[in-house]
């Protein structure tokens, strides 16, 4: 079975449990914390996937690392991944879980690329306008500054990209000019 299929199964089980206990939002935040730890500390997954480290030591490491910051549900999920030797699916599982929970809450994530930082008011306006475009009740906006855009915005929501950047407009114009001179 592929890592993604394994990740989806664990994500679905976690989603059902969190929804049943009415702690979906809390578990999403906890899983984001775990993902941040994994992304900023590569040794974390290296230790948990190392074949010479015993399962007991891995369990103790997870419990000591997260006992104060994770709910029993989230902690148990991590321990289950370790016990079943599926920890390599952790990041994919977190991503799948977030997708499922956002879908259930009629939400989506949007990454907004801009040449300069956006104010919270601008981000809120983008959230309202684009939530309607993608038929969602709420849009969670993350602003990423990319000076190469020169101006305008590039917005990624799921697999959709809305590109209104000056750079893309100049690139389009350049292609049209080159095509016209042939």
From Swiss-Prot:
This is ATP synthase subunit delta. It is found in: Cell membrane. It comes from Alkalihalophilus pseudofirmus (strain ATCC BAA-2126 / JCM 17055 / OF4). Its main location: membrane. GO terms for cellular component: plasma membrane; proton-transporting ATP synthase complex. Keywords: ATP synthesis, Cell membrane, CF(1), Hydrogen ion transport, Ion transport, Membrane, Transport. Belongs to the ATPase delta chain family. F(1)F(0) ATP synthase produces ATP from ADP in the presence of a proton or sodium gradient. F-type ATPases consist of two structural domains, F(1) containing the extramembraneous catalytic core and F(0) containing the membrane proton channel, linked together by a central stalk and a peripheral stalk. During catalysis, ATP synthesis in the catalytic domain of F(1) is coupled via a rotary mechanism of the central stalk subunits to proton translocation. This protein is part of the stalk that links CF(0) to CF(1). It either transmits conformational changes from CF(0) to CF(1) or is implicated in proton conduction. The lineage of its organism: Bacteria, Bacillati, Bacillota, Bacilli, Bacillales. PROSITE patterns: ATPASE_DELTA (PS00389). Pfam families: OSCP. F-type ATPases have 2 components, F(1) - the catalytic core - and F(0) - the membrane proton channel. F(1) has five subunits: alpha(3), beta(3), gamma(1), delta(1), epsilon(1). F(0) has three main subunits: a(1), b(2) and c(10-14). The alpha and beta chains form an alternating ring which encloses part of the gamma chain. F(1) is attached to F(0) by a central stalk formed by the gamma and epsilon chains, while a peripheral stalk is formed by the delta and b chains. It is a peripheral membrane protein. One of its GO terms (molecular function) is proton-transporting ATP synthase activity, rotational mechanism. It comes from the Bacteria.
């Amino acid at each position: 079975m592929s890592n993604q299929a394994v990740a989806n199964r664990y994500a679905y089980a976690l989603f059902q449990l969190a929804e049943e206990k009415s702690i979906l939002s809390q578990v999403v935040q906890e899983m984001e914390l775990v993902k941040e730890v994994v992304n900023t500390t590569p040794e974390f997954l290296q230790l948990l996937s190392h074949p010479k480290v015993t399962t007991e030591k891995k369990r103790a490491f997870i419990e000591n690392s997260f006992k104060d910051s994770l709910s029993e549900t989230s902690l148990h999920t991590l321990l289950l991944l370790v016990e079943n030797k599926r920890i390599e699916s952790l990041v994919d599982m977190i991503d799948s879980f977030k997708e499922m929970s956002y879908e259930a809450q009629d939400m989506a994530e949007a990454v907004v690329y801009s040449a300069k930082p956006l104010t919270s008011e601008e981000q809120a306006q983008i959230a309202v306008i684009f939530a309607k475009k993608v038929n969602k009740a709420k849009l969670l906006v993350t602003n990423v500054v990319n000076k190469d855009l020169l101006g305008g915005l590039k917005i990624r929501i799921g697999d959709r990209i809305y590109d209104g950047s000056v750079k893309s407009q100049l690139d389009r114009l350049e292609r049209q000019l080159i095509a016209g001179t042939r």
